[in-house]
């Protein structure tokens, strides 16, 4: 693959972080997913549980584009799915690695997005989801590029990597590896499974032809024990290393002491890949994972908030495309975990020590994780919050004042140009909301458990209402934040605020404004660039 191919892949570029149950502070399995795409409207999907007569057919549409791909036989029984978690706490996320372009099959019926949501509707465990998903592509053909899937339940987390076999060839080659319970892992648009233990059937599952097909295509010629799925089907290039693996590195760097050992791989100084999973230096909480989804390499050699590209107000974002040319040389910008083009983001918490309706929480937000608020969505919820739907016909190019996706984008796009000046106001409101939800969780779940002991439907209704209430209150608060920011920072000055209210003087008029001007470093560079043009004569 050339560098340009990797840039194209950034159109649909995502991040998954993983925490095994013995690596988390409360025994949860935890996985995260940011769906990053220019074109993806951030919404919370809901598929109610249902039963179907034998012979019912299901029409399949490509998740990315809405293109009709064909139809498959519907299952007799499907399970409730809200977002990317089902009623049995099974959660599936993904990142696209692309891989060898000649292996795409445009005649397949099952794309990666459909594979996720059909898989969730038909599976009670992660292992069952792997079987359902691989059986589907074997029967109906795999339409998409190479994918890494995170497939999790309250007890196990698996990474499954899959790629097609080429035009008109039904099925896919794939391998699934279980993440050890005491480890963390991640993937971010580059295949991460290298060698795997073909004899460990308990922790490694793979298609029978995963090695032989690579031999047949000329991708591999060694002995089986040396076979690397990633090297065979998604050869490493600069973009895969720097834009994709670097996000995994940032996670490992934060929670292990080995970050410095893996940095040369990210910088292209060695081809020795990072391990698929590592043991963290301390156990991670759900909040730790939420905060990691907001990462921009802060405090590392890849930090982008302090160089010239960060602009006047130290913004840790770079506009698309990531590459640019000056003269005949090509350059790039870093691609952190948190990015402006996210449609939605979640951190899934799955707990084996609680009944399924209570144990599974999808902490869900829309737009950029850095300025999102993660609200609790219980896996038993039978109704998605209206603000998380296509209310008023909202979509990626249709604005609605009642859509959380658009309200959060409205706020974040006010903040991006004046990031260091405005981000603290966002952080304060974000922290207040998330702390409130975190602190309320135990009490809410105790109430739900009491209801569940008497009447499951009452518990489901209670948690559905709580899911909707927290989302709506967050939406209302964020809309108020937006109006507050417009007033406070209007016209490049800052209004004075005390106890959350704009100050007035002794006669009731607005208090005098603060004029922040420009940062010292900018003014020095400004004078350097313009010389004596703006110098005041003596």
What name fits each language-model region?
Residues 313-449:
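Substrate-recognition/cap regions that form aromatic- and gly/pro-loop-enriched pockets
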Residues 215-365:
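Glycine-rich, aromatic-lined ligand/substrate-binding cores of catalytic
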Residues 116-122:
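Short, well-ordered beta-strand elements within core beta-sheets of diverse protein domains
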Residues 2-7:
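Short, small-residue-biased leader/transition segments that mark boundaries at the very start
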């Amino acid at each position: 693959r050339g560098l340009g191919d990797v840039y194209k892949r950034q159109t649909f570029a995502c991040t998954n972080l993983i925490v095994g149950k013995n690596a988390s502070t409360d025994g949860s399995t935890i996985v995260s997913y940011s769906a990053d795409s220019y074109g993806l409207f951030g919404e919370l999907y809901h598929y109610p549980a249902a039963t179907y007569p034998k012979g019912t057919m299901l029409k399949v549409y490509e998740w990315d584009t809405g293109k009709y791909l064909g139809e498959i036989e519907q299952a007799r029984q499907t399970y409730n799915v809200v977002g990317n978690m089902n009623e049995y706490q099974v959660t599936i996320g993904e990142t696209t690695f692309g891989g060898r372009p000649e292996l795409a099959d445009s005649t397949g019926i099952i794309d990666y997005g459909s594979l996720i949501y059909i898989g969730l509707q038909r599976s009670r465990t992660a292992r069952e989801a792997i079987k359902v998903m691989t059986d589907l592509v074997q029967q109906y053909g795999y339409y998409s590029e190479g994918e890494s899937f995170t497939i999790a339940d309250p007890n196990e987390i698996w990474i499954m990597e899959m790629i097609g076999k080429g035009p008109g060839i039904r099925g896919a080659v794939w391998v699934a590896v279980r993440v050890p319970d005491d480890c963390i892992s991640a993937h971010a648009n580059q295949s991460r499974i290298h060698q795997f233990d073909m004899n460990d059937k308990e922790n490694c599952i793979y298609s029978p032809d995963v090695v032989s097909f690579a031999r047949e295509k000329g991708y591999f010629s060694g002995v089986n024990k040396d076979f690397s799925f990633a090297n065979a089907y998604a050869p490493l290039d600069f973009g895969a290393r720097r834009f994709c693996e670097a996000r995994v590195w940032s996670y490992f760097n934060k929670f292990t002491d080995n970050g410095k050992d893996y940095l040369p791989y990210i910088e292209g100084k060695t081809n020795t890949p990072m391990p698929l999973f590592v043991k963290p230096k301390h156990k991670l909480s759900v909040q730790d994972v939420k905060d990691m989804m907001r990462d921009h390499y802060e405090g590392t050699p890849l930090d982008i908030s302090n160089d010239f590209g960060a602009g006047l107000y130290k913004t840790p974002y770079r506009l698309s495309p990531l590459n640019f040319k000056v003269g005949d040389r090509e350059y790039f910008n870093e691609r952190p975990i948190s990015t402006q083009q996210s449609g939605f983001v979640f951190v899934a918490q799955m707990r084996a020590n609680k009944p399924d309706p209570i144990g599974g929480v999808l902490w869900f937000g829309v737009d950029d994780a850095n300025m999102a608020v993660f609200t609790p969505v219980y896996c038993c919820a039978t109704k998605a919050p209206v603000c998380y739907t296509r209310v008023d016909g909202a979509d990626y190019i249709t604005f609605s004042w009642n859509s959380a996706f658009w309200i959060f984008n409205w706020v974040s796009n006010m903040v991006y140009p004046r990031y260091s000046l405005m981000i603290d106001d966002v952080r304060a409101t974000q922290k207040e909301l998330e702390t409130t939800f975190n602190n309320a969780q135990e009490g809410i779940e105790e109430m739900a458990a009491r209801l569940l002991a008497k009447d499951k439907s009452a518990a489901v209704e209670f948690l559905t209402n709580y899911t909707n209430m927290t989302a709506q209150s967050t939406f209302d608060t964020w809309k108020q934040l937006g109006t507050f920011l417009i007033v406070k920072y209007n016209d490049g000055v800052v209004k004075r605020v005390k106890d959350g209210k704009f100050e007035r003087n002794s006669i009731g008029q607005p208090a005098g404004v603060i004029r922040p001007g420009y940062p010292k470093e900018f003014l020095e560079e400004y004078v350097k660039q313009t010389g004596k043009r703006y110098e005041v004569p003596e």
